């Protein structure tokens, strides 16, 4: 069974289109109006070993908040759809990733109980067109819509770029590992995820 999804989400504020194939490493195309966010999305999808296209149009381009939130929602929905009933997935994963002085831990459970606990000390208020206050919000919106319980904790570091990038790398690697097929069972005592 192919594990991919095409999801479009359009509001009065944005139009987001996501194609995601979690089993085929291939081309990644990302286009949003926020340069640093493009870099982080490419990083996330690369470390997920996926094929993906993310296109985001901001209909009210006065702030980056709506783009960040709506991409997170749509990407989360795409992962949830691609996983289907989650039969056979490993389900859990954690990664501790360094980027120079920064060290970030990501631990997740594809539980269908989407929530995020984010502990990042981001000293810069903006980087490459992205308000850093939207980074935790991205992770929260993504987790809620993907059905992933997500913990992200900064263990060390002071460079905002490094901390954020280590977070996206760790999330990508953890998602890759947790979505791997390891058997034909639903990994839950309930028999359903």
From Swiss-Prot:
One biological process term in Gene Ontology: L-histidine biosynthetic process
Subcellular location: Cytoplasm
One example GO MF annotation: imidazoleglycerol-phosphate dehydratase activity
UniProt keyword terms in alphabetical order: Amino-acid biosynthesis, Cytoplasm, Histidine biosynthesis, Lyase
First-tier enzyme category under EC: lyase
InterPro entries the record matches: IGPD_sf, ImidazoleglycerolP_deHydtase, ImidazoleglycerP_deHydtase_CS, Ribosomal_Su5_D2-typ_SF
GO cellular component: cytoplasm
Reactions the enzyme catalyzes: D-erythro-1-(imidazol-4-yl)glycerol 3-phosphate = 3-(imidazol-4-yl)-2-oxopropyl phosphate + H2O
EC number assigned by the record: 4.2.1.19
Record-linked Pfam families: IGPD
Pathway recorded for this protein: Amino-acid biosynthesis; L-histidine biosynthesis; L-histidine from 5-phospho-alpha-D-ribose 1-diphosphate: step 6/9
Family to which this protein belongs: Belongs to the imidazoleglycerol-phosphate dehydratase family.
Record protein name field: Imidazoleglycerol-phosphate dehydratase
Lineage, top ranks: Archaea, Thermoproteota, Thermoprotei, Sulfolobales, Sulfolobaceae
Gene designation: hisB
